[in-house]
Amino acid sequence: STHCISSAASDVYKRQGTAGSASDAPKDAVFTIALRLPAWAGGETASDAVTVRGRDDISRVIRDGYLYLTGAWHDGDVVDFDFPMPVHMVAANPLVREDAGKVAFVRGPLAYCAEGVDNGANLHLLHADTARIASDPSCVSVDSIVFHAGAAAQDEQGLGEVDAVDMPMTTLTIPAWREVEDAAQTSALYHDWRPAERKTTTATLIPYFAWANRGENEMTVFLRG
């Protein structure tokens, strides 16, 4: 027979790692629910983050990246998810030349990016303070905001126009530094090398799916370290 499982995961799952699924099975309907244990949460080590509310008689088997829950399910039984969502710094394969020496940021199932509207122009001069982040991951701030999308058209055909939309979103604020633009250096194509002057700052990162919704500006996923 077929049994219905409803999910209350929605957008909160992507932002907070929490969700719930409810069963409408009649009393003592015995079947198995297979739940994927995502790699971003630790894979099979994340099975303890999945619980059946008020039930300790449901068997649990972990196999091939899934948690199998088997038992006599009742109408209204709820399976809760509470996956950890730490921020990870990610490096590309070293043979990907464009991203050599750079780092990207991932939290839960979402990759993040930097846009010029938040961080200023010339994003290639913006560096993530990887040493500080690696030594103290708590220095990365995870913030819940209301993201304001919307952009005016760039021509009479409506190119680039984005309707005004507000939606809840999670951003990351990371320690960073910028290379100071020296007029003597930027006025010529070449100049004598000297160490870059650093200006301490922070970088604001938004979920990758949200970029290009606030007018024309730069975007990068990988930041120099």
Indicate where each model-derived feature is located.
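Aromatic/hydrophobic beta-strand junction motif of beta-rich domains
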Residues: 14-17, 21-23, 35-37
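C-terminal beta-rich recognition modules with glycine/proline-rich loops and embedded aromatic residues
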Residues: 10, 22-26, 45, 62, ...
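Short strand-turn-strand beta-turns centered on an Asx-Gly dipeptide
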Residues: 49-60, 108
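Beta-strand-rich interaction surfaces with strong enrichment in secreted/lumenal proteins
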Residues: 58, 67-71
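Residue-level marker for the onset of beta-strands and adjacent loop->beta junctions
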Residues: 31, 65-67, 101
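Beta-strand-rich binding/interaction modules
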Residues: 28-54
